[in-house]
């Protein structure tokens, strides 16, 4: 709210598409999991990260540096339980299929399943929906018409489009923005102790400056913009 941004619905107000906290939306995610499981679009995948690192058939790496899950770990048969339990579940991608969409900023985007990304997790070991499934379910049930996010999630969009298709849902439009970088050319992220809104406020940066810089990054297509040193 300090930035002057307001929203029509959310956890701190009324709305027609709640609940708005993912911790309160477990039933929505479970229904989607059950549908995918019955269709055999997903399978249990108990392998740990260490298993993948030490496997004789190590995962290959895509052009974007993403590890592609080895097809050798796909089970031939499995019983569909009533609940996912405490084991990861992966979506089986259609190998060789080109997933394409027209991004409102970058234009035509294409990814090849099985090459640019592999079978991906939709249900986590701690018995919670993984990011890819949760955002698809939320956006569909909340009737989101346009998703705006960073261009580092372009491949995630391809994965999510496969989920929309498998669930028989219409997907929203997508607008992927350029990334905001610091003065060293690094993306602003929690994991790298990137600059936060709280820190900008402490330094006396005005809401107007933050908004203007963000808008400038959206306007410039196909080029990253660095945070000004002023």
Ranges and model annotations:
Residues 21-22, 56-58, 221:
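Short secondary-structure transition/capping segments
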Residues 44, 49-189, 196-201:
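Active-site cores that bind ATP or allylic diphosphates and position pyrophosphate for catalysis
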Residues 33-44, 98-109, 224-230:
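A short, terminal or domain-edge coil/loop segment
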Residues 25-29, 60, 191:
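Charged, often glycine-rich, active-site loop that binds/positions anionic groups
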Residues 21-25, 152, 202, 206:
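Catalytic cores of large soluble enzymes that bind and process phosphate-bearing ligands
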Residues 1-53, 174-176, 213-216:
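Conserved alpha/beta enzyme-core scaffolds, especially Rossmann-like or related mixed alpha/beta domains
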Residues 2-3, 8, 82, 94-97, ...:
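Non-catalytic terminal extensions that flank enzyme cores
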